[in-house]
Amino acid sequence: MKKNLNQKLINLIEYYNLINANFLLSNTPLKRNINNVTTSFGGTKLQKLKKLKKSIQLIENCELKKNATNLVFGDGNISAKIMIIGEGPGAQEDAESKPFVGRAGKLLDKMLESIHLNRTKVYISNVVNYRPPANRRPTEEEIVRYLPYLKNHIEIMNPKILILLGSTALNAIIGNVTVISKARGKWIQKEIGTVKPWIIASFHPAFLMRQPEQKKLAWIDLKMVRDKIKNLKI
């Protein structure tokens, strides 16, 4: 009993360290800029990812978690230098506890194959780790709550290339600077905690399924990724 209690206390301390207890207890309204909410986990990359996943599992008073079936953390090669960020899990992802496994995921796989990539060469995650009810877009508050975990996820992975799929991922990482149609297809370098990957935004596969005429622009973005891979010798 004492051992279990001690472990719960350790888990709770790790959780508060991650989200910053002062941030949680403050009466100040939520702010958009939370770049200072970071955590450093020790150990190997795999150990760090496991600790991060555990911290997300410890989240409380979250409607996303309450209504979801499973935590959807990440998928792919943890040694990959290419990381892809989507919006949030759908029904199939929630059921299988894996990102991009539904129809949009199948399209993403085809998009990756077109530039000679697959899930053994990339790592995939989402802005939020639990499925929003009815597949709705995550709210601003939900994005703000999960953003420290996402940024720490990116820090641990330390990708050379970061691909943001859709406006939710774009606005979470870059900020509300513009719409995805204007921001896509441009390379920028941005510090995310201790790492500074090359970042490009493109359309989310789910959007491309609704607007197939935009696939020609997505193909331009994919070719830019292919060229950057060659230039960086990944």
Placement of each model-derived feature along the sequence:
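Short, small/acidic-rich helices and loops at N termini and domain boundaries
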Residues: M1-K3
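A polyanion-binding, active-site-adjacent surface
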Residues: Q7-N11, Y15-L18, N22-I234
